[in-house]
Amino acid sequence: EVLDFVQSWTLEELQEFSRQRVNKNTKFLGLSATFSIRFKTLYEFAYWFKKEHPDILIIGGSQAFHNCEGLPLDYMVHGYGEIAMSAILSGDVKYTEHKWLNGHSFRRVDATHNYMAARMKDLSTHYEERDYIEPQEVLTVEFGRGCIFNCHFCTLTYRNIKDDHSRSEDNLYEELLENYNKWGTTNYSISDETVNDYTEKIERFAGSIKKLPFKPNMAGYIRGDLLVHKQKDWQAIE
């Protein structure tokens, strides 16, 4: 069960949602965001949840520690968490002990080294009827994780990666086609750190996208300076 737009919910709504969903089979509550999840309502809900369900793990995740500062976490996963989550739930995970400034202790799991999930070839998300996806919505899609550049201002963990770290083109094609057939989705936000970090990636995915029975609208972060010198990339993006 994934709850989006949580910052728009009231504390009472989050509590009611929890009462409806949490049962004896619930293993954990996950809190995660691309950027900060440090807002008052979520703090209040997380502490309420831990008081109500002390035996259920609260697992947080982000690329940066400070994004989860102060939350009552049992585990904090640093990096992409798919493989690390399996290790946590199996009870066989490597971790180090840490403490927030407010005194709360938690276990940090380093998914940037011990449980690397940056080179997964299947990055698809499968939505369900209860997600209520509307045709005009903008969904997120991943081409790959990490970046080949090593910019000095960047704090991204997976940078300066020189090999092909992107997903398979068939996997991307199948995800986009599934979303179109089920929900009528044509609009996407590409979550890659740099969409046009290397030409081969753009060419592969452009080939897959051109096979689709529709033309998707996609937006993502690109380096414009690279396009000036790479006419082939312009053609692939268009």
What name fits each language-model region?
Residues E169, Y173-E238:
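Conserved SAM/AdoMet-binding glycine-rich loop
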Residues E1-L176, Y180-G184:
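Acidic, low-complexity intrinsically disordered segments
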